[in-house]
Structures are given as structure tokens and as C-alpha cells.
């Protein structure tokens, strides 16, 4: 409870209430938190923390594995549940508000940028290893897999690195467009947000709370809200002295948000997040696994129904930057976003959505888009509707290749393997 109390007290302070008023002023604070969801977040996070530690070969220290769950009401921005750690008194770091590399969950923002800049879900992109113009480091997919030319929809579903770098490079000021899309959704710029053609691969750090809120914007027709814990404040006489306004900003074009959601449902229906289909209601989401050299530093699943957006992040070590591979599932090649993070998300969301009305997402109207040239050509054969030029490559190359989750078999999904990342 300490993490939640700290968040509420900080919010009240930001609203102008003094410590004296908060601690002994007779105020009654009504929060946005849902007790059943909060209990489920705590139970699920602690269950899989312990399971990952005890089933690891060899067994690992559960206290060094950190799970964060942040769940947001898509209509209001109210925080429904938040798990930031097991014990505020022994470790007050709240992992739900701690930014870490967002990995392939950041590709959703690149998809927003692409749809705004002349591409559609049917536009074709490079699915094979290639070296961007002016760079010396090739972009590779998981296992160095070669997909051939792929649609943007398939690139989202299968988390194909090369396609997103190809699209970002081909847009006018592509990296800036991706960053703007992320900011518009509700993810604030932070560490790792270098404006280069690999921005979509997810070195950019975002907290689980902000990521849940950013995806909530996609769920609610592109409307961004401010996350908050305080719904209402009453004085000692029961009079309402504060009530959250739940104001929304149309930050992403409604049909762009609908198309991104449509693509993210492909992740669940046929891609790396297939396990989320167990909710038996419309679900959109994205896996993410961040790799630096041979170290997995963060693993994610961020997904939403029409009403609830939830981000799950796993990190390890005191800093949250240590290798997660020690905690990988037996038989897995690495620690995947499609493993424990997705399993945690599904189990939590089964409780969170129980009894809720099954609501459909907005119907996406097709966006007419252009295609990048076939893989053998270094430049687009057909330019998108806007005037576009290749964004200059950064002088320094990223040292990491954020990994995709790999191709899902057509049979019952399993966590796909991760090859040794190529960081040259």
C-alpha cells in the first residue's frame, strides 16, 4: 500500500494541499483505484516473480527480479491498479514509475508516424537484413530472419525490426515523427530517445505507467488524458472540494488510432501476443524484449481492451538494468516479452475485465498508402504523398539491437527463440 499512498500524497501536494491538510485536515480522498484490480495486480506480480525465480535453472533470487503492472482507465486516465514492488519500506523504488527501455512496444508509435506520413497497413517494407543509407551497421531481425518484403501490418504482428527502420528512414524527418507520435500518445521524452532511424526499436525509456497511458490513447480514439489517482476530495463536512476533470486532448487522429489498434489486434490474433486472445474479447497489444549485446535488460507486454490499458514490465537487479536471462522459462532461449510479461498481463486482465461489457474497438477506415521499394533498392520507388527525403543517419550508431519476439508458428503459440543479437 505504501507505493499507492505515496502516489496519492504526491498528487494532493501537486493539487495544492499542504502536508497538514493531507495528514490531519479531515479530508476524505476518493481514489480511482479499483480494489479487485489492485489485489489482482499484487497477487499476479508476486506469483510470477516467485515462479520465475524458483523455476530458473539454477534457481535465482526473487528479490532481484522486478515486476511492474500499471493499469489505466482508457476513458478517464484514472489509475485502476499499480504494482511497483513488494515492500515500500525496504525498497521505495516504484518500478511502475521507473522508465526503462520500451523495446518493441515503441513500434506502435512508429506505426502512428507512418500512417500520418503516407503509409498504410498494406504498404510494403523491407523484411530482410539491410544497411540504411550512410550507416555501416546492418539492421537485422530476430535470428537474422529474412521475411522478404512485408506489409506494415505484418511488420507489427511479427515485430520485424528491418521494416520499421526502413519506414522511419524513408519518412521526412522520420525519427522526429516517431518521437512526436510517442509524445502525442502520452509517452514523455527521456533517456535513450536519440533521434535516429532505429528509434522504433525501443532503446527509448518509458515508465510502465506512462506506457499504459500512451496505449490508452490508442484505445480511446486517439484521446490523451493525464493519469491520476485522486478522483475526488471531500472536506470534513462531506462537501466536494476537488473533483478530477478527466479532460481529454485529441492528440492522435481518430482514424490513425483506429488503424494502429487494428494492427495491434493482429499481434494478438496471429502474432507474438497470441496468448492475450484468452480474454475472449477484443484485445490489442504489443510484446517487447530489449537486448544489449547478450543481455536482456527489459521485457514487456502492453495491451488494452476498449476500457482498460495495462502495461507489464520485467527488469532485474538493483538498477533494473541487469540480465533477465537468468530468469528465463526452462526451455526458452531467452527471457521474452511473450513469456512471463504476457502471461502476467493475461492473468491480471482476466480479473480486471471480469463482468465488464465486451466493447468493440473503433472500426478502422482504410488509409491509402504508398510502398517502399523492394529490398534490393536503397530508396523508395514510390514516394508517399508528402515530399520525403531520407533522414540523415546519426553520427553514432546505437550499440543495441532491440529484439523482436520472433515468428509465431501457425500452430499453438510458443515463446519463440532469440538469436544472438548482432551489434557491430
Regions found by a protein language model. Name each.
Residues 1-32, 183-184, 197-201, 216:
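Non-catalytic, structured segments within soluble enzyme domains
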Residues 20, 52-63, 193:
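Short helix/loop segment immediately N-terminal to the Walker
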Residues 31-59, 69-71, 82-83, 88-101, ...:
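A penicillin-recognizing enzyme superfamily signal
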Residues 65-66, 89-109, 117, 121-127, ...:
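Short active-site loop at a secondary-structure junction
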Residues 79-80, 102-115, 121, 163-164, ...:
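Extended, hydrophobic alpha-helical segments in both membrane/secreted and soluble proteins
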Residues 119-178, 224, 236-266:
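Conserved catalytic neighborhood of penicillin-recognizing serine enzymes
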Residues 138-140, 172-213:
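Mid-domain, small-residue-enriched loop/turn segments at the edges of structured enzyme/sensor domains
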Residues 363-424:
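Proline/serine/threonine-rich low-complexity "mucin-like" segments in extracytoplasmic/periplasmic regions
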Amino acid at each position: 500500500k505504501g507505493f499507492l499512498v505515496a502516489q496519492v500524497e504526491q498528487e494532493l501536494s501537486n493539487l495544492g494541499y499542504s502536508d497538514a491538510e493531507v495528514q490531519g485536515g479531515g479530508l476524505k480522498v476518493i481514489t480511482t483505484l479499483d480494489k479487485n484490480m489492485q489485489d489482482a495486480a499484487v497477487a499476479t506480480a508476486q506469483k510470477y516473480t516467485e515462479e520465475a525465480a524458483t523455476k530458473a535453472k539454477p534457481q535465482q533470487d526473487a528479490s532481484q527480479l522486478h515486476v511492474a503492472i500499471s493499469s489505466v482507465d482508457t476513458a478517464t486516465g484514472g489509475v485502476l491498479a499499480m504494482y511497483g514492488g513488494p515492500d515500500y519500506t525496504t525498497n521505495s523504488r516504484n518500478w511502475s514509475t521507473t522508465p526503462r527501455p520500451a523495446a518493441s512496444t515503441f513500434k506502435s508509435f512508429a506505426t502512428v508516424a507512418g500512417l500520418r506520413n503516407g503509409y498504410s497497413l498494406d504498404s510494403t517494407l523491407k523484411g530482410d537484413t539491410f544497411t540504411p543509407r550512410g550507416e555501416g551497421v546492418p539492421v537485422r531481425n530476430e535470428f537474422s530472419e529474412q521475411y522478404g518484403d512485408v506489409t506494415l501490418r505484418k511488420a507489427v504482428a511479427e515485430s520485424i525490426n528491418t521494416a520499421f527502420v526502413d519506414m522511419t528512414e524513408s519518412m521526412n524527418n522520420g525519427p522526429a515523427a516517431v518521437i512526436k507520435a510517442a509524445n502525442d500518445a502520452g509517452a514523455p521524452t527521456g533517456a535513450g530517445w536519440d533521434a535516429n532511424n532505429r528509434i522504433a526499436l525501443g532503446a527509448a525509456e518509458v515508465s510502465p505507467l506512462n506506457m499504459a497511458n500512451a496505449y490508452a490513447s490508442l484505445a480511446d480514439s486517439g484521446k490523451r488524458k493525464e493519469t491520476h489517482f485522486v478522483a475526488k476530495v471531500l472536506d470534513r463536512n462531506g462537501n466536494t472540494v476537488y473533483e478530477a476533470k478527466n479532460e481529454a486532448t485529441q492528440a492522435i487522429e481518430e482514424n490513425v488510432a483506429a488503424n494502429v489498434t487494428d494492427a495491434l489486434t493482429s499481434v494478438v490474433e496471429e502474432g507474438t501476443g497470441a496468448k492475450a486472445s484468452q480474454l475472449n474479447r477484443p484485445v490489442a497489444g504489443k510484446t517487447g524484449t530489449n537486448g544489449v549485446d547478450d543481455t536482456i535488460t527489459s521485457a514487456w507486454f502492453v495491451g488494452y481492451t476498449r476500457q482498460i490499458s495495462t502495461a507489464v514490465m520485467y527488469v532485474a537487479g538493483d538498477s533494473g538494468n541487469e540480465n533477465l536471462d537468468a530468469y528465463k522459462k526452462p526451455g526458452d532461449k531467452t527471457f521474452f516479452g511473450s513469456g512471463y510479461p504476457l502471461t502476467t498481463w493475461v492473468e491480471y486482465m482476466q480479473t480486471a475485465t471480469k463482468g465488464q461489457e465486451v466493447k468493440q474497438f473503433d472500426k478502422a477506415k482504410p488509409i491509402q498508402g504508398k510502398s517502399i521499394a523492394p529490398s534490393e533498392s536503397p530508396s523508395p520507388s514510390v514516394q508517399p504523398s508528402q515530399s520525403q527525403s531520407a533522414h540523415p543517419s546519426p553520427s553514432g550508431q546505437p550499440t543495441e539491437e532491440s529484439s523482436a519476439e520472433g515468428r509465431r508458428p501457425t500452430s499453438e503459440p510458443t515463446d519463440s527463440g532469440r538469436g544472438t543479437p548482432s551489434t557491430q
